[in-house]
A protein has these predicted regions:
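Glycine-rich flavin
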Residues: 3-6, 22-29, 34-108
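Beta1/beta-strand and adjacent pyrophosphate-binding region of the FAD-binding site
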Residues: 2-16
Length: 108
């Protein structure tokens, strides 16, 4: 059986876990972090970030309608869930990569 020896073992690679890991590593501690799914935690992967992107995307319909009063002509303002979902997932992937890079550069 493998043996592991860490000064700090963190469960969860969300914002708090990543910050704790980076700070401990900066203090010279040997740190490991475990994550069930993806780096970034609930906020980045399933909660805050996707929700904010959805709310932001939903505001465009009203903006397009209001723009007509200012000379803008948008005839085919059609929402595509597939295009939006792809863009949203690319942004989540980008943020996850940042978390991963922060941990790697901190020797975690």
């Amino acid at each position: 059986m493998a043996e592991y020896n860490f000064d700090l073992f963190i469960i969860g690679a969300g914002s708090g876990g990543v910050r704790a890991a980076r700070l401990a590593s900066k203090l010279g501690k040997k740190v490991a972090i475990a994550e069930e799914y993806r780096f970034g935690g609930t906020c980045v992967i399933r909660g805050c970030v996707p929700k904010k992107l959805m709310v932001y995307a939903s505001s465009y319909s009203k903006i397009f309608k209001e723009g007509q009063g200012y000379g803008w002509d948008q005839k085919d303002a059609v929402f595509s869930w597939n295009k939006f979902s792809k863009s949203m997932n690319l942004e989540i992937d980008r943020l996850e990569d940042i978390y991963h890079d922060l941990l790697t550069s901190s020797n975690v």
